[in-house]
Amino acid sequence: MRLAVVCFCLFGLASCLPVKVAEFGSSEEKAHYSKHSDAVATWLKPDPSQKQNLLAPQNSVSSEETDDFKQETLPSNSNESHDHMDDDDDDDDDGDHAESEDSVNSDESDESHHSDESDESFTASTQADVLTPIAPTVDVPDGRGDSLAYGLRSKSRSFPVSDEQYPDATDEDLTSRMKSQESDEAIKVIPVAQRLSVPSDQDSNGKTSHESSQLDEPSVETHSLEQSKEYKQRASHESTEQSDAIDSAEKPDAIDSAERSDAIDSQASSKASLEHQSHEFHSHEDKLVLDPKSKEDDRYLKFRISHELESSSSEVN
């Protein structure tokens, strides 16, 4: 890689060097070249107008560099001419000197042209590097954030109001009227929602009452059975007391008058308790709804109680 770079550098330096005419050959060729040297020099020289146009924009190269370059090139050419040529070939030296100057001028013109091109390319690149501000090209919808749905909704809410309906109205009046219309619509919507919700509440209340009644029915039945059992126990207890009283009444010789009075009082209290129990039983019958079996039991109890009361009253009399 290094060798390739060195070769390219040498090739570039060789191409930059001015072309020199070969000084070998016979005296006839030299004389022929000396005769036509002026024609060749004029042919190599460009027009003065073109030279001015090419040298005018050259600002990068200073005068000192050009003087140094000329001082380096002229002595080398003079040394080479003294070494290879004789004193008789002074005219040829003049021609070579003119050719060397022309070649130097042509090289300078080429360098100036390249410098102009580099300046133009540099300015173009700097202009291209300057960034232009990016302008938004898409319309942003009105509303909160960039939500398109909210923008469309806000646009749909803006109803066009014609001037024929409100010729003397201002923007504030129109907005107040729109708000009042929206509030009226909301007020109309609320009673409808309440009406729709009321039947559901009634249905729910009906369902709950029906369920509670269904749940209470077995409790009523159990309560009626418990009361019938209590009545049976009380009736049996009272019957035993009455039988004891009857037995004591059948033995008047053994029982004193005080005991008789106590027995009479106990019978009266038993009657009052029986009447009270019968009254309570009737009241419970009116309140409760009993099964047919419980009704039959109650009838049997009533009949038995009434029979016992009649028997006790007949015995007392």
Swiss-Prot record:
Region (Disordered): 43-297
Family affiliation: Belongs to the osteopontin family.
Statement: the UniProt record of this protein carries the keyword Isomerase: no
Post-translational modification: Extensively phosphorylated by FAM20C in the extracellular medium at multiple sites within the S-x-E/pS motif. The phosphorylated form inhibits hydroxyapatite crystallization. Dephosphorylation via a mechanism involving ALPL/TNAP promotes hydroxyapatite crystallization. O-glycosylated.
Range of residues in the leader sequence: 1-16
SMART domains: OSTEO (SM00017)
UniProt function note: Major non-collagenous bone protein that binds tightly to hydroxyapatite. Appears to form an integral part of the mineralized matrix. Probably important to cell-matrix interaction.
GO BP: androgen catabolic process; bone mineralization; calcium ion homeostasis; cell adhesion; cell differentiation; cellular response to fluid shear stress; cellular response to leukemia inhibitory factor; cellular response to testosterone stimulus
Subunit composition and interactions: Interacts (via N-terminus) with integrin ITGA9:ITGB1.
Protein name: Osteopontin
Biased composition (Basic and acidic residues): 174-187, 223-240, 248-263, 273-297
PANTHER family in UniProt: OSTEOPONTIN
Compositional bias of kind Polar residues: 49-63, 197-216
Short motif Cell attachment site, span: 144-146
A Pfam short name: Osteopontin
Phosphoserine PTM sites in chain numbering: 26-27, 60, 62-63, 76, 78, 81, 106, 109, 112, 115, 118, 176, 180, 200, 204, 209, 213, 219, 224, 228, 257, 261, 266, 270, 273, 278, 283, 294, 306, 311, 313-314
Compartment(s) of residence: Secreted
GO cellular component: apical part of cell; cell projection; cytoplasm; extracellular space; Golgi apparatus; perinuclear region of cytoplasm; vesicle
Comp. bias regions, Acidic residues: 86-110
UniProt keyword list: Biomineralization, Cell adhesion, Cytokine, Glycoprotein, Phosphoprotein, Proteoglycan, Secreted, Sialic acid, Signal
Chief localisation class: secreted
Chain positions carrying an annotated carbohydrate: T123, T132, T137, S219, S311
PROSITE patterns, alphabetized: OSTEOPONTIN
MF-aspect GO terms: cytokine activity; extracellular matrix binding; integrin binding; small molecule binding
UniProt superkingdom: Eukaryota
Modified residues (Phosphothreonine): T66, T170, T175, T222
